[in-house]
Design a protein with these regions (language model features):
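Charged, low-complexity helical/coil segments in non-catalytic cytosolic or luminal regions
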Residues: 1-143, 147-148
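Acidic, serine/threonine-rich low-complexity disordered tracts
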Residues: 142-165
Length: 165
């Protein structure tokens, strides 16, 4: 995925501004890639017994957070070669991700189209596999001589602890 909101340079710049963290040295170690399933959904909405309307939706499933969501538009992307050890292993199959994404988005469709005579039906879908960058940082406390490792999510800005063995 291209054009992500949070980058290592921005994070390092923010950390350098903080006066409370003067004794903590931060460095960007590596970039990891996590799978995001992107689905283009074609949904059949029965308005009456004889009339069916169709709607198109973009939906996604983030494997690192294991959460489905609705997308306003397709994200931009660009092909790039990355080492295999930097790509995190897939947790779900396409069918499992589609099922969870559809269950999440079906309630939103039902709320939006209250005039339905039957629940919405997923007719077709197109699947895209995109990988979002995750940035691995090392935090070194010079006073305690202690190192910790954290991962920065490029889309949400979440910083999570990890243990490296």
């Amino acid at each position: 995925i291209k054009g992500v909101r949070y980058t290592p340079e921005m994070f390092l710049k923010r950390m350098a501004k903080s006066k409370r963290l003067e004794n903590i040295k931060v460095r960007h170690m590596n970039t990891l890639y996590s799978l995001c399933w992107i689905f283009q959904l074609r949904i059949a909405i029965r308005v009456t017994k004889k009339t069916t309307r169709y709607a198109g939706y973009y939906a996604g499933f983030d494997e690192i957070a294991m959460t489905p969501g609705k997308l306003a538009m397709l994200p931009s992307w660009e092909l790039s070669d990355v080492p295999a050890q930097c790509v995190l292993q897939d947790k779900l199959t396409e069918d499992q991700a589609l099922e969870r994404t559809w269950e999440y988005n079906k309630t939103g469709v039902q709320r939006k189209f209250r005039i339905m005579s039957a629940p919405p039906v997923l007719e077709e879908h197109v699947t895209e596999r995109m990988y979002k960058p995750l940035y691995l940082f090392e935090f070194h406390n010079t006073e305690l001589d202690e190192k910790k490792y954290k991962v920065l999510d490029s889309l949400t800005g979440d910083l999570e602890d990890i243990s490296i063995t």
